[in-house]
Amino acid sequence: MSNIIKQLEQEQMKQDVPSFRPGDTVEVKVWVVEGSKKRLQAFEGVVIAIRNRGLHSAFTVRKISNGEGVERVFQTHSPVVDSIAVKRRGAVRKAKLYYLRERTGKAARIKERLN
């Protein structure tokens, strides 16, 4: 029984997901439905958390919009997510960057990873 479930989940997983880590700046393009129209919307920010659970994997992206912090959780293999592009690599030493929620301005900056 579990082999069938694993096989079905494997078929539904996206193959073109780039590798990214917490601290990286990513641009996620998401399909948005407004009335009868369907369009792509970009959400660019810093990855503050990743949850690896196979088909149920998710990641949290944080950005500052009009001086207000906005966080959005994306399901990695969701059909709503069109593409994920890594804009900048960040050098951090923690897996969850929740401390960035309390920081603003220059204190919330992340060093760039050079390799």
From Swiss-Prot:
It holds the Pfam family Ribosomal_L19. GO terms for molecular function: structural constituent of ribosome. The keyword Ribosomal protein applies. GO terms for cellular component: cytosolic large ribosomal subunit. This protein is located at the 30S-50S ribosomal subunit interface and may play a role in the structure and function of the aminoacyl-tRNA binding site. NCBIfam families: rplS_bact. Belongs to the bacterial ribosomal protein bL19 family. PANTHER family: LARGE RIBOSOMAL SUBUNIT PROTEIN BL19M (PTHR15680:SF9), RIBOSOMAL PROTEIN L19 (PTHR15680). This is Large ribosomal subunit protein bL19. The gene is rplS.
